[in-house]
Amino acid sequence: MFRFVSSIKPFVLKKSYLKQYNVKLLQAKFDVLMTAYPEIKAVLPDDISAKKLLVGNFKYLTKVYCAFTSYLNGKSTKDRLSIKNAFVRGGFNYDSHKTKISNFLMDITNQFEIHNCIYCDIEDVTTFTKANGTKVRKFETEHVLDKGDCPLVGMSLYNFVPSCRICNGPDIKGTKTIGDSETEIARLSPTAEGYDFANKVKFEVKILTPGVEDLKATSHVDDYEIVFNIGEALYQKTIDLFELKSRYNHGIVKLELLKWRDIRRRNPDNMVQQLADINMIPFGEMFEELFELDFRRRMHYPMEKARRDVMLID
């Protein structure tokens, strides 16, 4: 739903991430694998290296993933498992590095914004600190490209997206890719350059019952549905994969959005101005008091995009 990027310069971030590894040793192990599997080497990008696997951009990772998995698809189940296990044992074992990877993402000096699930924006995944000073990680380090299908991208910086357990679980995303072709996959990761779900998709409230009294939607929620106005068809795949329509129409999530729609409809700009005049405060201050835009942005409230969209507030 939102791009997942650090606010520091990319070359600084990459340099910091590479320091987490013995890149020379990983390159040596990779060279051994390429010697052992020349047919795989032949289908991978010519400029592939351990460094590029660790910090290459998502489009590059997609190319590696698609080449590797396409090659394996031509093999028997037994051979596929054997090859993948060989790459895991040969140096590309995410489990051996997962603690330092999650710590890297949580490290405030790396300036990642991790507050709500990047995919759904419904679940709060903010890391918190216990009384004894220990940090508790609430997010899951989700692999956009499955590490089980392609161990080569298992430790790749731009393959990580902090998500909630629901989005990362087997009933939703699991090991699936977002998109079907290499081109689609390369564009649909929140880590991809040009990813723009937030601006290309808008939440809207649809009235299901013609002629229904449209004053207090929260009192008859079944007459309404949360839908998506999709400016670029590609993002429908994200909506479908993460079951966003079902989840935003479920229980308290839907009720909360309808509540704020009601509040906005009762308080159009002319009413806000009247209230501001009565209270002798500026329009902007009154607007903030009613709709909490700055406050919720600062506090990183979940579902804030959807809330603003249904209130028709940019």
Language model features with spans:
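Short cysteine-rich clusters marking metal-coordination/redox-active sites
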Residues: C117-C120, C164-C167
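N-terminal accessory alpha/beta regions
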Residues: M1-L105
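Short, flexible, mixed-charge glycine/proline-rich loop motifs
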Residues: N103-E113, L152-L157
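Domain-level detector of nuclease and nuclease-like folds
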Residues: P151, P170-Q236
